[in-house]
Amino acid sequence: QWQAFEAGSRAVGSFPSNKLQDGSRIAVIGAGPAGSMFSYFSLKMAQAVGLDLNVDIFEPRKFCHRGPAGCNHCGGVVSESLVQRLATEGIMIPDGVVQRGVESYTLHMDVGDVEIATPLLEKRIAAIYRGNGPRHSELSDTQSFDGFLLQLAEERGANLIPRLVTDVRRDEEKMHVICADSHRDTYDLVVLASGANSRLMEILENQSQEFQSPGRTTTFICEFKLGREVINETFGPSMHVFLLDIPRLEFAALIPKGDYVSLCLLGDDIDDELMQLFFSSPEVANCFPGGFIPEHVCHCYPRINIKAARPTYSDRLVMIGDSGATRLFKDGIGAAYRTAKAAAKTAIFHGVSAADFKQHYAPLCHGIDKDNQVGKVVFGFGSLVQKARFARRGRRRRAPRRSGTRGRTHGPPCRSPRSTRRRRARRSR
């Protein structure tokens, strides 16, 4: 049976062999960014200290498949700072994975639109290809971000096991991983990186009174296929963010990527009523060609982590990424990187007992939790701005506008600065 996470039938860190040794086995459940990065870092660190480990990654999905089998339920936006951090780790993201460099944010409100350039016009964020999610998308040779990270882990020596894990149990000093096809195996450390949409977290919560799975809320993500030329003309190199007075809506954005535009709605349990209010807003329709919102080619209602698991570790068990602690409504990939590296460092250099994770891994999770408390205040202030028209006008006036753009209320579809310059050139002639 599932036993105490931090205290109970065993004292914290009471396992006598809490250090990984040559031949130790690690099971990583989930090959998303968190799971693949943990595998990469743990094998890299183990090699540095001369430790021979066996790392198995359990992942039934294939990221090149169309439809749900290849979908990662994510908007796929990373900051330039994260790209640079990964580069210092030897992880150079291929150009094909980055679908578009985002040069600005376009803020849409009922009082007008404002385009806000990034500092020094640097490309501070990037829209990446997470997987072949759209059901009617064409087969693509483009490598996904998740597939790229998984390949790096495999090149380091990780083994990919295409099985769905349905249970994790402890027996004496070992952990047992049980799969849907009744396959089971024994490991010295289990790393949960299955994400917020996995039922495995609920199963573990039912087995232990000490464990609380991450707090979650329902979101909405969909894809519009418009083609590169139309996207370049109407959306440009900008991420379009909406500040609308819609109850329970905390964040909404249209993100251009290749031939598709991704829509992400985040808030308090997104439902049909909220979505209808959003899609009926003229500010949204005006972003599309002709002021008409086309049918989306796929959609999903993924759950996201809004509160860390309690606790995020136990003897020979650690939870990372969305399974453990992540940033509120943003930078989930960045949090996956931070938690994966911290957990790997703890396991390789310190040990795999609850005491080791409490001392060397838990402080990072607590720090993320504190950041999220501040984030809730910021989002609360944003909700007040959404409700107060005078505040939205003030926000529009104070925004550092980019040259060649102007605020617009219910005007024609939003266009890129390039198309704006072409129209002005035609007028001058």
Residue ranges and their predicted role:
Residues 74-77, 122-151, 199, 222, ...:
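Short beta-strand to alpha-helix junction loop
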Residues 348-429:
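C-terminal helical "tail/cap" subdomain of flavin- and related membrane-associated enzymes
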Residues 98, 184, 269-347:
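FAD/FMN-dependent oxidoreductases across multiple families
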Residues 31-32:
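Glycine-rich Rossmann-fold phosphate-binding loop(s) that bind the pyrophosphate
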Residues 1-26, 41-54:
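Extreme N-terminal leader/targeting segments of oxidoreductases
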Residues 41, 151-286:
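Predominantly flavin-linked oxidoreductase catalytic cores and closely associated redox partners
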